[in-house]
């Protein structure tokens, strides 16, 4: 869904309106980009999917990287300590795990779930919420996200029903209004899911044939990280890169999970990901406290290649955090 602001950006950069000097600069940049297509960028250029926007992908992801760090679109990393009194990391985890189940029940696209959690964290960074209303914040945030992403979205009554009618239709609509006002209607933002699609495509290049477990395993690790409050501090692109790193390690434990191509694509070195990857590994091994029952059950299904049940080493070799060496 394209916002008015995005439309304005596109209209302001119409090549037909450019002066000869501006057009020469645009043409120079495009030629330079085409001459330098290699590694991860080459994958985008080879894609026959018009939605992948191969020619413009570098500019698009550069814009998304700028957008993901905008203060207005980021939650406080310590909002539970600074803003909340009744809410704890554990209660937040229970809510998010339940919302994973709700998203499955309503057959929502994955981006709706990611946006929902983003809205919850941003709202709780601004407003103190009583524990009794936390579930209402969750379903109202999902109601907003479903309007933004879904072609056929659930009705307000469906969200009331899923809470066993703990809240009324008026409660949900009022909380929807409160969330929208608090977020100043800034609803579009990149999520972990935004970056995963491209990172996974690059990560598949090392396999002779596409690995069927890689994508669902990356998604599983990303959803586990959504449950964990300590991951709120990480930007979406870093979470996505960390999920790919750990997924590759789980699938091929004797091979270095990172590569020159992935480093170029993600803009992260292996060492940049260490803290986040180790948290994800703890979550995967259930060494961290937190509710993840719904997420684990979801990814134990055949349609997700049973990735929640893949065995893994207890820790990663120290050498995996060193810079990738090109041979």
Swiss-Prot record:
Name a Pfam family for this protein: Cyclin_C
Q: Which GO terms describe its molecular function?
A: cyclin-dependent protein serine/threonine kinase regulator activity
Membrane-spanning intervals of the chain: none
Superkingdom of the source species: Eukaryota
Any idea which UniProt keywords this protein has?
Cell cycle, Cell division, Cyclin
Task: List GO BP terms, alphabetically.
Answer: cell division; mitotic cell cycle phase transition
Q: What family, per the record? A: Belongs to the cyclin family. Cyclin AB subfamily.
Q: What is this protein called?
A: Cyclin-A3-3
| Species of the source | Arabidopsis thaliana
């Amino acid at each position: 869904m394209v916002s008015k602001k995005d439309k304005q950006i596109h209209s302001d950069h119409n090549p037909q309106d450019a002066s000869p000097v501006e057009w020469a600069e645009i043409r120079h940049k495009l030629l330079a980009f085409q001459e330098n297509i290699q590694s991860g960028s080459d994958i985008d250029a080879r894609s026959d999917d018009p939605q992948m926007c191969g020619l413009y992908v570098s500019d698009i992801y550069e814009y998304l990287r700028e957008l993901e760090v905008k203060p207005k679109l980021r939650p406080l990393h310590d909002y539970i300590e600074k803003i909340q009194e009744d809410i704890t990391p554990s209660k937040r985890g229970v809510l998010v795990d339940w919302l994973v189940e709700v998203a499955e029940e309503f057959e929502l696209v994955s981006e709706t779930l990611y946006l929902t959690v983003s809205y919850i964290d941003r709202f709780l960074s601004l407003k103190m919420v009583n524990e009794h209303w936390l579930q209402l914040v969750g379903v109202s945030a999902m109601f907003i996200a479903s309007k933004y992403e879904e072609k056929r979205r659930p009705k307000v009554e469906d969200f009331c029903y899923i809470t066993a009618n703990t809240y009324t239709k008026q409660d949900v609509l009022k909380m929807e209004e409160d969330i929208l006002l608090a977020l100043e209607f800034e609803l579009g933002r990149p999520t972990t899911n935004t970056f995963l699609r491209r990172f996974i495509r690059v990560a598949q290049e090392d396999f002779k044939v596409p690995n069927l477990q890689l994508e669902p395993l990356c998604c599983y690790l990303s959803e586990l990280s959504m449950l964990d409050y300590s991951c709120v501090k990480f930007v979406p692109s870093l979470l996505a890169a960390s999920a790919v790193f750990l997924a590759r390690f789980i699938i091929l434990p004797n091979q270095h999970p990172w590569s020159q191509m992935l480093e170029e694509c993600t803009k992260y070195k292996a060492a940049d990901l260490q803290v986040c990857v180790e948290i994800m590994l703890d979550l995967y091994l259930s060494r961290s406290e937190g509710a993840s029952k719904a997420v684990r059950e979801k990814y134990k299904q055949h349609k997700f290649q049973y990735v929640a049940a893949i065995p893994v080493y207890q820790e990663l070799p120290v050498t995996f955090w060193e810079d990738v060496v090109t041979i």
